[in-house]
């Protein structure tokens, strides 16, 4: 279900402060975050966030196409190893 327009996008409060601090310092460092549920805002474009996937932080460089999406969409939590190979086809 989509969030109501009148509520606006959800972003954890500490995230705005961290992004502003990095942007004002001028250094392009990875901002470690655990908030996968936060929406990517236009002021985050050009910054790199380390989004936690449950095991480690995955670096995500924010571009304009990502605005409006959630951080969690860009850091997969599950590893896909593929389906099991067909044993008959493997023997030939």
Curated annotation (Swiss-Prot):
Gene3D superfamilies registered for this protein in UniProt: 30s Ribosomal Protein S19, Chain A (3.30.860.10)
Top-level taxon: Bacteria
Organism: Bartonella quintana (strain Toulouse) (Rochalimaea quintana)
Task performed by this protein: Protein S19 forms a complex with S13 that binds strongly to the 16S ribosomal RNA.
GO biological process assignments: ribosomal small subunit assembly; translation
Transmembrane regions: none
Gene Ontology MF terms in the entry: rRNA binding; structural constituent of ribosome
Family, similarity comment: Belongs to the universal ribosomal protein uS19 family.
Full protein name: Small ribosomal subunit protein uS19
Disulfide bonds listed in the record: none
PROSITE patterns: RIBOSOMAL_S19 (PS00323)
Pfam families per record: Ribosomal_S19 (PF00203)
HAMAP family: Ribosomal_uS19
Database matches in InterPro entries: Ribosomal_uS19, Ribosomal_uS19_bac-type, Ribosomal_uS19_CS, Ribosomal_uS19_SF
GO CC list: cytoplasm; small ribosomal subunit
Keyword Ribosomal protein: yes
Keywords annotated in UniProt: Ribonucleoprotein, Ribosomal protein, RNA-binding, rRNA-binding
């Amino acid at each position: 279900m989509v969030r109501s327009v009148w509520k606006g996008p959800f972003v954890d409060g500490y995230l705005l402060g961290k992004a502003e601090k990095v942007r004002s310092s001028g250094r392009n460092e990875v901002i470690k975050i655990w908030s996968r549920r936060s929406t990517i805002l236009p002021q985050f474009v050009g910054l790199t966030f380390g989004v936690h996937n449950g095991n480690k932080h995955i670096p995500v460089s924010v571009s304009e196409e990502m605005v409006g999406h959630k951080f969690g969409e860009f850091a997969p939590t599950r590893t896909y190893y593929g389906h099991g190979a067909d044993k008959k086809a493997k023997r030939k």
